[in-house]
Structures are given as structure tokens and as C-alpha cells.
Regions:
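Catalytic-site neighborhood detector that most strongly recognizes the C-terminal catalytic loop/helix
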Residues: 67-69, 163-186
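DNA/chromatin major-groove-contacting recognition/catalytic segments
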Residues: 6, 79, 174-230
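C-terminal catalytic core of Y-nucleophile DNA break-rejoin enzymes
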Residues: 5-6, 66-85, 96-122
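Short basic/aromatic active-site micro-motif
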Residues: 30, 131-146
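Basic, Lys/Arg- and aromatic-enriched nucleic-acid-binding interface segment
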Residues: 6, 10-41
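Active-site-proximal segment of tyrosine recombinases
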Residues: 47-48, 133-134, 144, 152-163
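Conserved tyrosine-mediated DNA breakage-rejoining catalytic core shared by Y-recombinases
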Residues: 12, 41, 50-82
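Alpha-helix N-cap/helix-start motif at helix boundaries, enriched for small hydrophobics
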Residues: 34, 42, 46-50, 157
Length: 235
């Protein structure tokens, strides 16, 4: 089973935000608000889709987590508060932020499903060619990934997600993979220097002009030069 990934590319993340912000159709406006709330709060999709305007009017979101049954309080920064005020100004306090187009038998509204939110994320992943597996946890993980990148406070993030250990948090936000990737960027066990045409010369790297001089020779002469240098190194 593929592990759901955060959005790590800052350019793609910014592009998604800017493009969704310009959407004026109901579906696009819903996707924009859901996306921004997700990456600014780290709430699970199952909690986001149940939010009402009264939950997001102040400086904090206070809600009962569907998964754990615990009360959680999430601070809202000025950016997401401005978005909420702009997009929700005409809503009643008890109105759902993400209502389904369908109605219950008595005519009352209910929220979109997590499956609907997943489908929205798949549309985004396809349109912007996002790397890795994208799903409902992508927004929560994107929040965690960038919160850690900017603040470097793993313990705060662990408490935010209510994880049992910092190691769990690192794996969850994909930073364990990021650290592994960085660790091999300059990793070269044998110290080999690789030149054009796949030739390998151990030891002191050749000067650029010397490398080009050999490269421009035909293959038979290249082989003789490399062979003679290998013999010199063995002496």
C-alpha cells in the first residue's frame, strides 16, 4: 500500500493556492477553503468537513475530534482568518462550511463525505502532477511538513498531532525520507570521480581541459590512456 505524501514542492504548493483562489464556481470555492484550512490547521479531513462557521469565527478552532473524541483547540493565524472572513461572510453561524448538494429527507443539509474530499485531492494531484500518493491525509501532512521546516520544533508538532513519539511524527510528515535523501546527496564511499562516457578515475580529479582532451580522442586511444594511468596507480 502506497504511503500518502505531503506536498513538498513549494512552487507547486503556491501554484495550487493561487489557482484555487481564483476559482469562482461553487466547487472551486469549496476546494480552495478546504485546501487552505487543511494546510493551515493540520486537522483531519473527517474533522474539516464537519466544521460550521461558528467553529472558525475567532482566533481558535475548537472542535471534538471524530477519531479520538477529544476536544482540540487549533490557533488560526492572520492568513487563514482573512480567508475565512472573506469566504464565509454571508454564512449563518450554524451553517456548514462544506455542505453537500444533496439534502436529507427533512430538507436539512449535511456535509460532504471524506470520499468527496479525496476525489478533490485526486483532481489536484492529476492537474499539478504531484509526486507520490496523494490522499485525504495529504493536507494534514503538508501542514506538518512545512510547520517543521519553518519552526524546527518536532516536540510541538508531536503534541499537535497527538503522536506517541517524535519518530512517529517524522515518519508521518515524510521528513524521515527527506533526511535520508539529503544524507546521500554528497555520499561517495569509494571517492570515485565519474567523467563523461562512464570512465572512472580514482584519486585526484583530472583538470577539465585534460578530461576534454581525452574525451575527444577515439575510443581505442582513450582505452590506452586509461589503462596506462591504472598501471601507474598500482605502482
Amino acid at each position: 500500500m502506497n504511503k500518502v505524501q505531503p506536498i513538498k514542492d513549494p512552487e507547486k504548493l503556491r501554484q495550487i493556492q493561487e489557482d484555487l483562489a481564483t476559482r469562482t464556481d461553487p466547487h472551486g470555492e469549496r476546494m480552495f477553503l478546504l485546501f487552505e484550512l487543511g494546510i493551515h490547521t493540520g486537522l483531519r479531513i473527517s474533522d474539516l468537513v464537519r466544521l460550521r462557521k461558528k467553529h472558525v469565527c475567532g482566533e481558535w478552532i475548537e472542535t471534538v475530534e471524530k477519531k479520538t473524541g477529544k476536544i482540540t483547540r487549533i490557533p488560526l493565524n492572520t492568513t487563514i482568518r482573512a480567508i475565512i472572513q472573506d469566504r464565509c461572510r454571508d454564512m449563518d453561524d450554524d451553517q456548514l462550511l462544506f455542505p453537500s448538494r444533496q439534502r436529507l429527507g427533512d430538507g436539512s443539509q449535511y456535509s460532504i463525505t471524506t470520499r468527496c474530499a479525496y476525489d478533490d485531492m485526486q483532481l489536484i494531484a492529476k492537474q499539478y502532477h504531484l509526486d507520490g500518493h496523494i490522499g485525504c491525509h495529504t493536507l494534514r501532512k503538508t501542514f506538518g511538513f512545512w510547520h517543521y521546516k519553518q519552526n524546527k520544533d518536532l516536540e510541538m508538532l508531536r503534541q499537535w498531532f497527538n503522536h506517541t513519539s517524535q519518530a512517529v511524527t517524522l515518519r508521518y510528515i515524510g521528513m524521515d525520507e527527506e533526511e535520508r535523501r539529503k544524507s546521500v546527496q554528497a555520499f561517495n564511499p569509494g571517492g570515485a570521480v565519474y567523467h563523461p562516457r562512464g570512465t572512472v578515475y580514482r584519486g585526484k580529479p583530472m583538470q577539465k581541459s585534460e578530461s576534454l582532451e581525452i574525451k575527444n580522442l577515439d575510443r581505442s586511444k582513450q582505452g590506452k590512456i586509461w589503462g596506462s594511468r591504472a598501471q601507474q596507480r598500482r605502482k
